[in-house]
Amino acid sequence: MSSDTKKPLPYQRILLKLSGEALMGEGKYGIHPPTLMGIAEEVIELAQAGVEVALVIGGGNIFRGVAGATEGMDRASADYMGMLATCINSMAMQDALEKKGLHTRVLSAIKMEQIAEPYIRRRAVRHLEKGRVVIFAAGTGNPYFTTDTAASLRAMEINAQVILKATKVDGVYSADPKKDPTARRYRSLTYMDVLKQNLNVMDSTAISLCMDNKLPIIVFDLTQRGNIRRAVLGEGDIGTLVGGSETVWA
């Protein structure tokens, strides 16, 4: 074997789940272009390394369906508005990636042909095989389901090997580390421990889907530049692995 033989990738196909708030930067609303471009550059690094990348982006930086419902809106209508917010974020990410020369496709669970392709599973897989980044918009297309659940569903449909759940902390903790100085980080967690302890990873529907299909989740800190690449390539102790055989402290 030659010395320049490439090391096999731990994950060939991944789904990156971003919250809408991840695009705000230090702002309180909307999209912060430098933050958006920084995330796009990390996605490009993965694609250039040969990783097939799909994304699901929330819409909470623009509108959150649950919040609208608590203010008296019809829940289904509020959720559909949230789905439209995810489409705005998906288009913004597509623009950022394509400005850097990376081919992308936005596939929407709600038909809007002028701005996105309709979601078809086989088409999504084909785009990935051709080296395009696929951005899944509009959640599952159904109210009452979160974008975390959409991420789990789409990851399974495209046969992704892992979900990367981007957050503002470096993994899953026993308590909120900003409020409790005794909080400890987990290196790995079983799905059942996440559900039993009601840990803030994803909603229970999303976790249950991953558990039933043995799909691992890596929860990591998006604010540290380079962590997306490090998590995918297995470089160092990055975040918390959900789906391990046992629960282990970091």
UniProtKB/Swiss-Prot annotation:
Q: Which GO terms describe its biological process?
A: 'de novo' CTP biosynthetic process; UDP biosynthetic process
Per UniProt, UMP binds at 59, 79, 140-147
| Localization, UniProt | Cytoplasm
Q: Which GO terms describe its cellular component?
A: cytosol
Keywords in alphabetical order, please: ATP-binding, Cytoplasm, Kinase, Nucleotide-binding, Pyrimidine biosynthesis, Transferase
Record flagged with keyword Flavoprotein: no
Which branch of life, at top level? Bacteria
What is stated about the way this protein's activity is regulated? Inhibited by UTP.
Reaction it catalyzes: UMP + ATP = UDP + ADP
GO terms, molecular function: ATP binding; UMP kinase activity
Q: In which pathway does it act?
A: Pyrimidine metabolism; CTP biosynthesis via de novo pathway; UDP from UMP (UMPK route): step 1/1
Predominantly, its location class is: cytoplasm
Query: Where along this sequence does the record place binding of ATP?
Result: 17-20, 60, 64, 167, 173, 176
Please name the InterPro entries in this protein's record. Answer: AceGlu_kinase-like_sf, Asp/Glu/Uridylate_kinase, Uridylate_kinase, Uridylate_kinase_bac
Q: Which Pfam families match?
A: AA_kinase (PF00696)
This entry's Enzyme Commission designation comes to 2.7.4.22
Family named by the database record = Belongs to the UMP kinase family.
State whether it acts alone or in a complex, and with which partners, per the record: Homohexamer.
What does the UniProt record say this protein does?
Catalyzes the reversible phosphorylation of UMP to UDP.
Q: Report the protein name in the record.
A: Uridylate kinase
Q: Which organism is this entry from?
A: Myxococcus xanthus (strain DK1622)
Report which gene this protein is encoded by.
pyrH
